[in-house]
């Protein structure tokens, strides 16, 4: 008999068939308590779990005594109780490599659109305000040769560094838990403490996961240290930033503009002051949202679950020591 797995995110037909070739697949709409109660027998027998954008916590795991592996269609896993999974020797798989280039593209788009005011001036054109040759009130700022600070020099940070170094001749500062020799050799990136990065960068790009240590890492103190001409970019996780402090910094002119793909609460409230600011580019967590990349992430997650339930955890596993 094939192992039983629960799928809580729709998959393309070919990927669903790949999953079904290895497992008995039960599809549910979500992981809400109501769904779990209504499908109690299925959850009780499931050895695998695959999907995204749902919380997997200790309460859910109590209902899944046979669970051996869970696979998320994402690189981030802050919605998983990793300690609870590890305590129960349940593997957690994710998709860290598939989306690197696409998210770096999104970061670059935010850098360019904020500096050159692309969204703002496009809306002015649509509103019929372009009635003569444009003047300084339409101008943006240059990107090339400006200093870019990267907070979090992982795969995505490296991909962004490659773009700005070779494409825009930008000096790069970075702050991370450790020195990144490859970034320094390939892109002439300079490691520095966070305060120095904030004080010297024209663009500050935040690419950090959400952990207890990074929650509200950026607040009023950090924004106050940035140049008043600086542009802040966040495409990591929303709660790494104290959003109220960001709003205040923008309102007071402590920073020039912001390009945001992530927020403390998602979807962003329609009442958020960020939405009324012309110098803010706010997009709905589109970092990896292309047809090609989302398919690749789903395919990776399927393969990850197959590997995990076959005892193969050489890659893409958050807690591989569970398999020891």
Swiss-Prot record:
UniProt main location, coarse: cytoplasm
One Pfam family here: 2-Hacid_dh
Sorted UniProt keywords: Cytoplasm, NAD, NADP, Oxidoreductase
Compartmental location: Cytoplasm
Reactions that this protein is recorded to catalyse: glycolate + NADP(+) = glyoxylate + NADPH + H(+); (R)-glycerate + NAD(+) = 3-hydroxypyruvate + NADH + H(+); (R)-glycerate + NADP(+) = 3-hydroxypyruvate + NADPH + H(+)
EC class of the enzyme, as a word: oxidoreductase
EC number: 1.1.1.79, 1.1.1.81
MF terms in GO: glyoxylate reductase (NADPH) activity; hydroxypyruvate reductase (NADH) activity; hydroxypyruvate reductase (NADPH) activity; NAD binding
Coiled coil: none
GO CC annotation: cytosol; plasma membrane
Annotated family: Belongs to the D-isomer specific 2-hydroxyacid dehydrogenase family. GhrB subfamily.
Function text: Catalyzes the NADPH-dependent reduction of glyoxylate and hydroxypyruvate into glycolate and glycerate, respectively.
Name this polypeptide is given: Glyoxylate/hydroxypyruvate reductase B
Source species: Shigella flexneri
Classification of source organism: Bacteria, Pseudomonadati, Pseudomonadota, Gammaproteobacteria, Enterobacterales
